[in-house]
Amino acid sequence: MSAGGAGGEAKGGYPPQTIMALGIVGGLVGIYLGNFAPPAYSFFGGLGAICATVWGADAVRRVASYGLGTGVPSIGMLALGMGILAALFGLSVGGTAGPIVAIVVAAIIGGVIGALANKVIGMGIPIMEKAMVEISCAGTLVILGLSVVIAGSFDFASVVQYVVANGYIALIFIIGGMGILHPFNASLGPDEKQDRTLMLAVEKGAIALIIAGFASSLHEGLMAAGLNMLIGIIIWYVAFSKHYALIKRDAYAVVGSGMLPSSEELQ
């Protein structure tokens, strides 16, 4: 991560504690419902992943507002890297309590990395340690939620077989990381608004659910996969429509660019 220009504390209508509660409670409830419900309802894991994505995107927004520069994409990938380690460790030793163990481990990893970033690298961001804890935990919940969508449960053996061994973990890494890093990266600037940024996070989380739903077809069958994708498409459409409305609210003008001029017209 590289430091960008000078920045400051991000402002927004939704307090961090509220969004954190949404991410933790919504994420865990979705993951556990997806685990214990029949495979046709594994989309609950995706709903939990969306809640965690919103939490992670807000944490990125708050820490990146201090001036991360090109570190905005990097911190999103870092979140999922920490998330994979914490999620697999938690599931391997925690059994039914695996997701909770994973969050605790993620918080420890995030705290250590945040302290190194501030104390050793010298980034000097006041909320770095706290933000890295949040981002690490959010990334872990995203990994767990999307794994439940694909595998139908968070049983360690099932996740290893249906998510890790076949390479879908790399897919989750990319789509989950994009959901956390992209919203602020696409919205940053003096006119950035919290609600618009977080609505984009919902949209990206829904796309992740659609893709994970498609991947689940190899294990859960076409009916369950179709339901996963349908839920994702509905959420995506609603979030996209709302995000576009927020863009029009904040933009000075929305105009059509028309066709690109021909070479003759440019002469």
UniProtKB/Swiss-Prot annotation:
Membrane topology: Multi-pass membrane protein
GO cellular component: plasma membrane
Primary location: membrane
This protein's pathway: One-carbon metabolism; methanogenesis from CO(2); methyl-coenzyme M from 5,10-methylene-5,6,7,8-tetrahydromethanopterin: step 2/2
Function: Part of a complex that catalyzes the formation of methyl-coenzyme M and tetrahydromethanopterin from coenzyme M and methyl-tetrahydromethanopterin. This is an energy-conserving, sodium-ion translocating step.
Keyword terms of this UniProt record: Cell membrane, Membrane, Methanogenesis, Methyltransferase, One-carbon metabolism, Transferase, Translocase, Transmembrane, Transmembrane helix
Lineage, opening ranks: Archaea, Methanobacteriati, Methanobacteriota, Stenosarchaea group, Methanomicrobia
One Pfam family recorded for the sequence: MtrC
Protein name: Tetrahydromethanopterin S-methyltransferase subunit C
